[in-house]
Amino acid sequence: METAVAYYKDGVPYDDKGQVIITLLNGTPDGSGSGGGGGKGGSKSESSAAIHATAKWSTAQLKKTQAEQAARAKAAAEAQAKAKANRDALTQRLKDIVNEALRHNASRTPSATELAHANNAAMQAEDERLRLAKAEEKARKEAEAAEKAFQEAEQRRKEIEREKAETERQLKLAEAEEKRLAALSEEAKAVEIAQKKLSAAQSEVVKMDGEIKTLNSRLSSSIHARDAEMKTLAGKRNELAQASAKYKELDELVKKLSPRANDPLQNRPFFEATRRRVGAGKIREEKQKQVTASETRINRINADITQIQKAISQVSNNRNAGIARVHEAEENLKKAQNNLLNSQIKDAVDATVSFYQTLTEKYGEKYSKMAQELADKSKGKKIGNVNEALAAFEKYKDVLNKKFSKADRDAIFNALASVKYDDWAKHLDQFAKYLKITGHVSFGYDVVSDILKIKDTGDWKPLFLTLEKKAADAGVSYVVALLFSLLAGTTLGIWGIAIVTGILCSYIDKNKLNTINEVLGI
């Protein structure tokens, strides 16, 4: 049984009892000796060899161990140096943390334990700072993303609001247009439709005019390009002819010199001519390519010109058809407008008849008849001398005023102070059509203003001057339309009726001024 080594001392192995362990290569030690011829001397020799072998092995092991220890010592020294450098670096980096402690312990050098605690605390603080920095960066990015999302949402909200507002605006316009169309008569709607069709037809013609203009511009450019290319082609063909002539000349020379081709003493001119012919052939081929390319470009330009001319012809035919549609739309619009005008005249006549009936009911048949006569006489009559008309009116007014109190006379001013201009405009348009007044008929804002001023000034001349100005083109019929529409849309009182009639008579028939009071029963 082999004894286990407990430890080594000076390179010698010992067991756990402190005895030296001797290991033999051939058996165990025996004090009586059993080997032949050797006796005790043989055992001693074998023991010495064993001890020597063990010592040799132990030395090797020790050297190995020593080398390992040296390596470990070196590694430890390196680790220590690294630790020291690391410690110094940490100490320097964390000097803000240990400054206070160093100030209190300036008389002594901090121990490694204190530095380790400080380093640990600093590392924890650094970890916390990094954690907070990462958290802050993450929060910042999340906040930026949230802000970006908010801005995008806000922008989208504003876009939706704008779209909503635009939709509401268009809806209001559509509703207003629908309401306006609903209020129109069938004749007026027909005019609207005819106007839209005419506008569409005219727009199509304008569009085709633009297309024709563009095509003509392209055609002109193509023709100029073709003419320029034709000049280039002429030059290229001339160059090709010269190159072909040169090649033919050299080819004939080669043929002429070919009998000497095999004569070493006389073949040099032949080979020189052959070389020159090859060069001339290449030049001729290049010129032919240039001519072919130019002809190709001309053919392409001609094809473009043909295509453009066909397009111009097609658009011109479409334009002619478009012009026909415009003429047709114009005729349809004219018919629709005539139908509308006839309908409006009929309505105006009906409204005027109703107006005369109202006058009959309110002021009697005689006054209604007088109003009709004044209207008929005004047709085609130019405005007379305003001063004469004013003088005749003033004379009638003075007589009339004696029959009415100031309160009665103020009735017309009170009525005009709250006049409804929309109603007045409606009646004015009807009377203008009834009296066949052409051109624009403006409202009587200035007429009302002049009448209202009379209440304070008593001066009627500004009113007569205004009426004269309005009737300068349309004639006295315009004055009739203005004042009849005033009678139809406003309750003026009997004095106001007499005054309005007096103004008309002063312009149309001064003799009737003497009969107004009788007709009205004043």
From Swiss-Prot:
SUPFAM superfamilies: Colicin. Its main location: membrane. It is a multi-pass membrane protein. GO terms for molecular function: pore-forming activity; transmembrane transporter binding. InterPro entries: Channel_colicin_C, Channel_colicin_C_sf. Disulfide bonds: none annotated. It is found in: Cell membrane. It comes from the Bacteria. This colicin is a channel-forming colicin. This class of transmembrane toxins depolarize the cytoplasmic membrane, leading to dissipation of cellular energy. Colicins are polypeptide toxins produced by and active against E.coli and closely related bacteria. This is Colicin-E1. The gene is cea.
